[in-house]
Amino acid sequence: SGDGDSASIGIGQFIHAIRRQINMVYFVENNGTYGLTKGQFSATNDLESKNKYGEDNLFKPIDLASMAIQLGASYVARSFSGDRDQLIPLIKGAIQHKGFALLDIISPCVTFNNHDTSTKSYDYIRNHNEAVGKTDFVPLGEEITTSYKSGSSIEVNLHDGSKIALEKVNSKFDPTNPGKSLSYIR
């Protein structure tokens, strides 16, 4: 879907698809503009941005990724269409994900929103694209299960040969007590 539909006329469907945790991948081609109306700002365009004709955007943007997180989406990512190394693992991860997956892909409109005063232009995004973390695709492996008693710990071997230590809290522990929970994990 485009950002125009997802953040404007189709925002109701977008919100309820997330709320219902529909098992799907929702790609948004986010260019901050309505191409069919020759450069009108979409609801995702940044406040400080100008259009091709030099007009200021007067409205705060709708951030589809933040909205998806707030609504409980279980897989949310944003990437730049010009960064294959980042985008491909995100797409693979979204396809493998069970539940609602949103990929907000900043994809400059080279006809109506690719100029120096646009925060969604190719050059602006290329120069300001900062990965929050390294993404990689982890293929599905055989499920690792274990069983151990309350109050004990166990070391579990992972698929890559590394180990993880797990500790099961005592059955009398109250996880609803924030103070005790924080003390326990410190």
Q: Residue ranges of each PLM-predicted region?
A:
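Short, basic, glycine/proline-bearing loop/turn elements
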Residues: 1-2, 70-78, 165-171
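Structural motif
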Residues: 23-27, 66, 74-77, 100-102, ...
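Class I SAM-dependent methyltransferase SAM-binding "motif I" and its flanking Rossmann-like core
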Residues: 34, 38, 52-53
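Conserved thiamine diphosphate
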Residues: 42-94
